[in-house]
Amino acid sequence: MATAALRQIWIPRFLPVPWFLCGSRRYASSSFKAADLQLEMTQEPHKKPDPSQPLLFGKTFTDHMLMVEWNQEKGWGQPRIQPFQNLTLHPACSALHYSLQLFEGMKAFKGGDQRVRLFRPWLNMERMLRSALRLCLPSFDKIELLECIRRLVEVDQDWVPGSMGTSLYVRPVLIGNEPSLGVGHPTRALLFVILSPVGAYFPGDALKPVSLLADPSFIRAWVGGVGNYKLGGNYGPTVLVQQEAQKKGCEQVLWLYGPDHELTEVGTMNIFVFWTYEDGVLELVTPPLDGIILPGIVRQSLLDLARTWGEFRVVERKITMKEFLRALKDGRVREVFGSGTACQVCPVHQILYQGKHFHIPTMENGPQLILRFHKELKAIQYGSKAHEWMLPV
């Protein structure tokens, strides 16, 4: 598929870059071109995973990767698809010392027709560009990068598992590669993309609900920070809190914010509450994109689907623990769930908050909405339902 043709299809789907990231210094006009893509096929292909064995997330990688280098003097170099290999970095590399790094997560699915399709990848490209500009990393043409990624997936498409629930995880990364201990705008950068076949998050379609630790002493993101960008520095500090949750018998963390203990995210997922609101109206609510919430691709997809159905109110609004617990006590909460690329939709059945366990009746209610979202997403992602969200490889 020619890049020019793809550009006409995708341009209307991209969101505008925030005005404060559009200065001339940050928003360079140069970019690499998919037409210049170089291809070096591996001479030592890896053994593909046994389809009968479970695939652990992020442990297996395909034969090839995409690499593009950038420096301030010459701009972007030629993109190349090359054999999967280790990186060589200077010990003073700015990504290692000052977290000048960002990443994306997206998936390719193989349908019953054996065709491989990417799920809403232009949204990932938009989010990746916003993250790059926030870190003063080089700009790039979203459509050119997307075409390079499509070509990479095409080269390694035999690695895409074919059973329901499995997929090929696509991990684009952009890092500052400045060989200096000074903190500043990097003059070198490296963009690379690796691929990993992954198994079903819920084997056999059996949804497993999770319990959450809600501790307001831990904060994931704050107003004026970078919680709405997909940066590596947002994830490392959450590991300790995740361990604390596990020590208390919880699988995930419910991140709270502010004096009112606003619900923000679940682990690395966006959070949704399906309930009857105080005015008696059935609604699906998720926190708004106010600067501390990551604009998840699946989050947006669930909102889009629910609004298309038009069967209940769909809102983006702040949710406090006080109003949530009041609704729980009144029996107005139907389902609570997280959404993300890894799990798609993950049910929640319990919250540990201020020393008390609160049961959420998600599973007792079907969970009808979660199952409906799962069914609809699978139909779209695996090609049984034609949809503009999917990009054929």
UniProtKB/Swiss-Prot annotation:
Source organism of the structure: Bos taurus
Assembly description: Homodimer.
Enzyme Commission identifier(s): 2.6.1.42
Catalyzed reactions: L-leucine + 2-oxoglutarate = 4-methyl-2-oxopentanoate + L-glutamate; L-isoleucine + 2-oxoglutarate = (S)-3-methyl-2-oxopentanoate + L-glutamate; L-valine + 2-oxoglutarate = 3-methyl-2-oxobutanoate + L-glutamate
Annotated positions of the N6-(pyridoxal phosphate)lysine modification: 230
Protein name, UniProt field: Branched-chain-amino-acid aminotransferase, mitochondrial
SUPFAM superfamilies: D-aminoacid aminotransferase-like PLP-dependent enzymes
Keywords, in A-Z order: Acetylation, Amino-acid biosynthesis, Aminotransferase, Branched-chain amino acid biosynthesis, Lipid metabolism, Mitochondrion, Pyridoxal phosphate, Transferase, Transit peptide
Protein task: Catalyzes the first reaction in the catabolism of the essential branched chain amino acids leucine, isoleucine, and valine. May also function as a transporter of branched chain alpha-keto acids.
Uppermost EC category: transferase
Modified residues (N6-acetyllysine): 322
One of the record's GO cellular component terms: mitochondrion
Transit peptide segment: 1-27
Family indicated by similarity: Belongs to the class-IV pyridoxal-phosphate-dependent aminotransferase family.
One GO biological process term: lipid metabolic process
InterPro entries recorded: Aminotrans_IV, Aminotrans_IV_CS, Aminotransferase-like, B_amino_transII, BCAT-like_C, BCAT-like_N, BCAT_family
GO molecular function: branched-chain-amino-acid transaminase activity; L-isoleucine-2-oxoglutarate transaminase activity; L-leucine-2-oxoglutarate transaminase activity; L-valine-2-oxoglutarate transaminase activity
Transmembrane segment boundaries: none
